[in-house]
């Protein structure tokens, strides 16, 4: 079972289209799940994949706090980050690095080094 939480309706629609094109079933939940206990729709979650959530301090603090709690409960938490200022300096182990092509319309360079981190401890 794959559950995806996305509060942006355009991104949720893109997730559904991507899943359909790839022949997979994804349950899209269009609500903010940060901080919720692992029960109900979240029961049985064993891995959380998150991308680029440390772009502003309030969001990063809220998300990272919840991710640390999940990791302490045995959930594997992987976080993709392109070098944002509010990424924590501790409690992470590097899992992978990628050079991601970007658009100069959106970024200040054509390639952005991006790291996938695993929450630890």
Task: State each model region's role.
Residues 1-121:
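S-adenosylmethionine-dependent methyltransferases
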């Amino acid at each position: 079972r794959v559950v995806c939480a996305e509060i942006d309706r355009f991104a949720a629609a893109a997730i559904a289209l991507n899943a359909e094109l790839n022949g997979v079933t994804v349950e899209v939940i269009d609500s903010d799940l940060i901080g919720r206990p692992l029960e109900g729709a979240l029961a049985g979650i064993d891995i959380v994949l998150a991308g680029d959530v440390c772009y502003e301090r309030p969001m990063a603090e809220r998300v990272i706090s919840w991710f640390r709690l999940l990791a302490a409960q045995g959930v594997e938490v992987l976080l993709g980050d392109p070098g944002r200022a509010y990424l924590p300096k501790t409690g992470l182990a590097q899992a992978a690095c990628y050079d991601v092509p970007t658009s100069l319309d959106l970024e200040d360079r054509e390639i952005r080094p991006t790291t996938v981190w695993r929450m630890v401890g």
